[in-house]
A protein has these predicted regions:
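Mobile "lid/hinge" segments at catalytic clefts and subdomain interfaces of large enzymes
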Residues: 1-7
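Long, contiguous binding/interaction regions
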Residues: 8, 14-65, 69-86, 91-169
Length: 169
């Protein structure tokens, strides 16, 4: 799907940085701790991917998305908490959908919902009809699950069903 970036009422241009590093000689617990520290220090997203390095050594590729001003603090954490000896840095432009978070009443209680508007596009032409996508926020669903004892999938399905029914009204 091609979305008209700058100037669109539905999407905006953004700049984000990607920090990457290969990490071996570590434990899953250490990687989990590093992820927690990076997210607490401002990382927008953190992920690990399994990779093989030279001499077929298994390792992890650490990928961190962040704003430019957060790079020094995040690199300091990566160097202090991992066995890496280098960090790659890439500046990336991206298009992101505009979104809003609403608190919606449901039969299970109030749920925070992220709403995105996705224009139907054909090349550079943006049509008037727009798809509305709703994503219940994790913390809201988790709180309902803890309170009711129901599964995450069950609660999410019910919330989405109620959102769709209310949209039709």
């Amino acid at each position: 799907m091609l979305i008209r970036p700058a100037g669109s009422e539905y999407a905006a241009q953004d700049v984000i940085y990607k920090l990457e590093s290969n990490i071996d000689d570590t434990t899953g617990e250490a990687l989990g701790y590093v992820m927690e520290r990076l997210l607490a220090a401002g990382a927008r997203d953190v992920q690990y991917s399994p990779v093989y390095m030279k001499k077929n050594r298994p390792a992890y590729l650490l990928t961190v998305l962040c704003l430019e001003e957060d790079i020094p603090a995040l690199e300091e954490i990566i160097f202090a908490e991992t066995t890496t000896i280098g960090i790659r840095r890439v500046r990336m432009e991206r298009s992101i959908l505009k979104r809003h978070i609403y608190t919606i009443p449901t039969s299970l209680g109030d749920v925070e919902v992220k709403m995105c508007l996705v224009p139907h596009c054909n090349g550079n032409e943006v049509f008037e009809d727009v798809e509305e996508r709703c994503y219940p926020e994790y913390e809201s669903i988790k709180a309902i699950c803890k309170r009711t004892g129901r599964s995450y999938q069950d609660v999410t399905r019910q919330v989405l069903r109620e959102l769709a029914e209310n949209k039709e009204d």
